[in-house]
Curated annotation (Swiss-Prot):
InterPro entries: DNA-dir_RNA_pol_su2, DNA-dir_RNAP_su2_dom, DNA-dir_RNAP_su2_hyb_sf, RNA_pol_bsu_CS, RNA_pol_bsu_protrusion, RNA_pol_Rpb2_2, RNA_pol_Rpb2_2_sf, RNA_pol_Rpb2_3. It comes from Arabidopsis thaliana (Mouse-ear cress). A zinc finger (C4-type) spans 1055-1083. DNA-dependent RNA polymerase catalyzes the transcription of DNA into RNA using the four ribonucleoside triphosphates as substrates. Second largest component of RNA polymerase IVa and IVb which mediate short-interfering RNAs (siRNA) accumulation and subsequent RNA-directed DNA methylation-dependent (RdDM) silencing of endogenous repeated sequences, including transposable largest subunit. Also required for full erasure of methylation elements. Required for intercellular RNA interference (RNAi) leading to systemic post-transcriptional gene silencing. This is DNA-directed RNA polymerase D subunit 2b. It catalyses: RNA(n) + a ribonucleoside 5'-triphosphate = RNA(n+1) + diphosphate. It is found in: Nucleus. PANTHER family: DNA-DIRECTED RNA POLYMERASE I SUBUNIT 2.
Amino acid sequence: MDVDEIESAGQINISELGESFLQTFCKKAATSFFEEFGLISHQLNSYNFFIEHGLQNVFESFGDILVEPSFDVIKKKDGDWRYATVFKKIVIKHDKFKTGQDEYVEKEILDVKKQDILIGSIPVMVKSVLCKTSEKGKENCKKGNCAFDQGGYFVIKGAEKVFIAQEQMCTKRLWISNSPWTVSFRSETKRNRFIVRLSENEKAEDYKIMEKVLTVYFLSTEIPVWLLFFALGVSSDKEAMDLIAFDGDDASITNSLIASIHEADAVCEAFRCGNNALTYVEHQIKSTKFPPAESVDDCLRLYLFPCLQGLKKKARFLGYMVKCLLSAYAGKRKCENRDSFRNKRIELAGELLEREIRVHLAHARRKMTRAMQKQLSGDGDLKPIEHYLDASVITNGLNRAFSTGAWSHPFRKMERVSGVVANLGRANPLQTLIDLRRTRQQVLYTGKVGDARHPHPSHWGRVCFLSTPDGENCGLVKNMSLLGLVSTQGLESVVEMLFTCGMEELMNDTSTPLCGKHKVLLNGDWVGLCADSESFVGELKSRRRQSELPLEMEIKRDKDDNEVRIFTDAGRLLRPLLVVENLHKLKQDKPTQYPFKHLLDQGILELIGIEEEEDCTTAWGIKQLLKEPKNYTHCELDLSFLLGVSCAIVPFANHDHGKRVLYQSQKHCQQAIGFSSTNPNIRCDTLSQQLFYPQKPLFKTLASECLEKEVLFNGQNAIVAVNVHLGYNQEDSIVMNKASLERGMFRSEQIRSYKAEVDTKDSEKRKKMDELVQFGKTYSKIGKVDSLEDDGFPFIGANMSTGDIVIGRCTESGADHSIKLKHTERGIVQKVVLSSNDEGKNFAAVSLRQVRSPCLGDKFSSMHGQKGVLGYLEEQQNFPFTIQGIVPDIVINPHAFPSRQTPGQLLEAALSKGIACPIQKKEGSSAAYTKLTRHATPFSTPGVTEITEQLHRAGFSRWGNERVYNGRSGEMMRSLIFMGPTFYQRLVHMSENKVKFRNTGPVHPLTRQPVADRKRFGGIRFGEMERDCLIAHGASANLHERLFTLSDSSQMHICRKCKTYANVIERTPSSGRKIRGPYCRVCASSDHVVRVYVPYGAKLLCQELFSMGITLNFDTKLC
C-alpha cells in the first residue's frame, strides 16, 4: 500500500468516526490532560526538580573551597610575614644530567571528615515533594486541609507568597540583531558570552568608501574575526571562507569579508605564520581590566563555546555564526524577534530559587573564608566548620527576597528585579488559580516598550489574548491558556538516540566541507549533521510518538537555513494537539476513558512547541477538520482552550466586546465573593470574604466540565429584568428586590484578623535593655477593655466596636502596648489563636466576623462585564410581576447593552431560562423529553435559533419577553419586558468599607489639608468633576463649606496699593512701642493692607513662588 492509499484510508476512518464521537473524545482527552497535569503542575514540577537536582548542582558548581593562611582576602594580596627568613641565590653544580620527564610531588590528603551541618533554610512549596500535605484524597481534607488547595505557593512569615513566572530571553540559540548588526552567543555566565559584530571600519583611510568589517567581542576585548579563525587552527584564507560558506553574490558582503581580512593584516601583519594569531589573542585578553588567570589555550577551551570540544569544531561554529550574520544583513535570514515566545523561556520557582541561592551561598562562602583566614592568621587552631559558616545568610536572604519581592537579575549580578513574588489572592478559588498561572515580562516603563504589549502570533494557544490588566502592566502581565504547559528539564541524554536516527558526527576537522549536509542543533549546541533533513525529522517525530524519545522534545526543520533545531530544555511553552494521521487508531479501540499518557504513547496526541507549530497545519476544530482532512496535520481540541481559565468559563464570550470580557476575566472574577476555602475556621487571613449561599450557574462551558471545578463560579442565579424603574437604575446603577435580600440573597460575611506577637523570656534577639512585653489585661488609656479576659484576649462572641482593645499587651512596669480597633472597624469575635513562630516569639490572632447584607452603594457584576452599584432597594410588592407571578430580583437599565456591546448576557438569560423551565413533550416523538441545550462554550455556542426554539418548547416567548403588571397600580404594562435568570456576582467593593464622613479632623502638617486615610478620619477625594456637579446643582454654599471652611481655611494680607503680599512682622514705629502686624515692605506702610481668606494650599503655592523669585500681583474687591 503506497502513501496515497494510506492517506485515503486514514481519511475514510476519520470520516467514519463521526463528528459527535470526535467531539466527545476531545472532551475526554482534555479532561485526562487536566487530571494528568492539572493547572499548576508547572510550579510544582519546577520546585521539585530544583530540590531533587538543581540544589545539588548549585553546590557542585562552587567546587572545593581552598583557604590559604598566607592570603588576605580583604586586601587581595599576600599577608604579613610573622617569621621571615632571608634567602640568597646560590649556584649548585651537579654531575648528573636530567633525562626523562618532570616529576611532581602531589599534596596528599591525610584526613577526610564528613558531617552534616546546617547551611540554611529553604522555604517549602505547598504540595511539593517536601510538603506533608502533598497527599491527595479525602484523608487530606480530614486533617483540616482545604479541598480547593492545589499548592504551588509558599508560606513566609504567615503570608502566602507565589512566584510570577518570568519571561526571560532564551540563551539556547543564536541571537541576531540589526541595531547594531550583531550575532550573539548568549550565556548566563559573562565570560562565556560571545558576540560577532558587523560595523563600520573606523580606521579606514577613505570614509566615503568605508566598508563594514567583522569583529568579535570575547572576554571583554575586541578581536578581528579573521585573527580568531587562525588562532583556532585555520591554516588559510580559503579555509576560513569555506567555513563561512556564504552562498551569495552580494558585493557588499564580499567587500566586508575583504575589509575584515585587511583589518586583520593591519593589526597583525604575520598572523598567518606560526602562532602569531594566538599570541595576538593572548595579548588582547591579558590587556583587559580584569584578565583571566588561565592561559590563552585554556581560555579558548573553557570560555569559547564550552559546549564544543576541539578548536576545529569551535572554528566551524564561528564560521556558522558569521554566516548567520551575513545572511541576515543580506536579507536572506530574519532577525530574531524579542517578543516571540520561541525566543523566550519561562522561569519558575526552581530557576529563580537556584539563582538566588547561588548569590547568597557565594556570600556565605566569602564570609566563611574570611573568618577562617582570620583564624589561620593567628596562633589558634581551626574550630569545627559550623563555627564559621553562618546559616542565617541564606535563610535571611531568602526571607528578605520573598518579603520585598526583589530577586537577583538573570544577567546583571549587581541588580535586583522587582515583581517576581506577589501575595496570593484568596478572594475566591478562581483568583488563586489566576495568580498561579500568571506570567510577567520585565521591561522598563520609562523606556520604549515597542511591541511587547501587543499580541504576537506565538501567543496562540499558549497565552490568553484577553486576560491582561489595564494600566502600565497592560500586555506585559499575561495568563497562560488552559492547555498551556511549561516544559521541564530533560534528564536523559538524547545525543545517542539522535545517532540511531541517522545523525552523523561532527568531526574536529575544518578542511572537510559539509557538502550540502544540514546542521543538527540540540539546545543551541551543534551536535552533528544529517544528509536528508526531511527523513531525519520524520524519524524523530515517529519515535517521539512511540515514546522512544522524550515527549516534550521540540523538533524544528528549517528548510531555508538548512538546520534541524531540537530543544529539550526547560521553560518552553507547549500545548497538546490532535495528530490527524493517527486518529484512525480510535476506531480500533473505543474505551470509556482515555488516559493522557496512553494518548501520547499512541501518537494520537502530541505536545507541540512554538517553533514546531510553525510547520504544522492546524484545524480550528472537528467541524473544520472533517471538511478537508487531507489539508491538515493537526487539530485543536477546542477553540475555548485557547483562552485562560478566567475567560474560558465566560458564557457566550465570543458575542461580547473584548473589553468587557477583559474586565470580567481580569477584575470582576477576581473580586467576586465566593467560598474561598473549605477550612475557614482554622485560617487566620488578614481579611477574607465568604458568600453564604454560593450557587453554580444553569449553563455549562466545556472548560468548567473538563476541569470539574464548580467552585470557579462565585455568585448566584438572579432573575434579572431589563427595564427602567423610577430612574434609579441609570448610569451603572441597579435596583434590587428588598425581599430577596432579606431572604439571604448575596449575603456574605467578612472576617478580619488582628495579629500581635511578644518576645519570650529566653528570646536571644530581644535587647537586654528592653522590657518584656507580654499578653495580659491592663488599664488602658487608649481604648476600652470591657471585652477582655485576664489573659488579654476577648471572649468568643464578644461584640466589639470602634475604640475597643482587641489584644491586650503590657510590660512589667505597666506600659500599654495593646492593639485597638480603628475607626469604622467592628465585629463579633469568632476565634482566638495563640501559638509561636520559628523565631521563638509567641503570637496571637483574633478574628472578628461581620455579616454583610447588600446595601446602597455595593457593587455587583454579571459575567459579561456589566458592572453596577446598588442604587435603590425596592419593596417586592412594588416590583413588576409576570402572569405566572414571577418577581425579578434585579432590574437593570436597557441602555447598558448598546453602549457596552454585551449581547452575550441576553443570550445567557434566554438560555438559562430555557434550562430552568420544564421542557414540554415533543409531538410525534417517542422520547419523553427533548434534549436540553446547556452549553454556552465560547466559539461553539448554540445558535440563536436553537435557543429561541428551546424557549418556545417550554411555553415562553421565543425572544424571552414577558407580559408584566405594574406592582404599584396593578395595571398591565403596555410594553413587554425581557426577563430571565442571569448569573450575578457580588464584588468586594462595599459602601461600608468606602463611605467617609467627617466635620473636621486630622490634616497634613505641610498642606493643612485633610489626610487621605479613612481609618484616620481622613477626608474624601474631591476632584474637578465633583466640583462641577455641585456648581451645576447650584450648591455654592455647600461647595464653599466643603472645599474651604472644613478643609484648609486660611488667610493672607494683601496691599491694595501695590497689589503684593504683605508679611506679618514685628516692627517699631516712631512712637517707640513694638507692634506686630501686617506690613507692606514695598510701600513701607500698613495703611492699604487688607485681609483676605484663601485656601492654605493657594497660600503655600504663592510662598513657594516667592521663594523662587516670582512675584505675584493680587486684585482685591470688597464683598
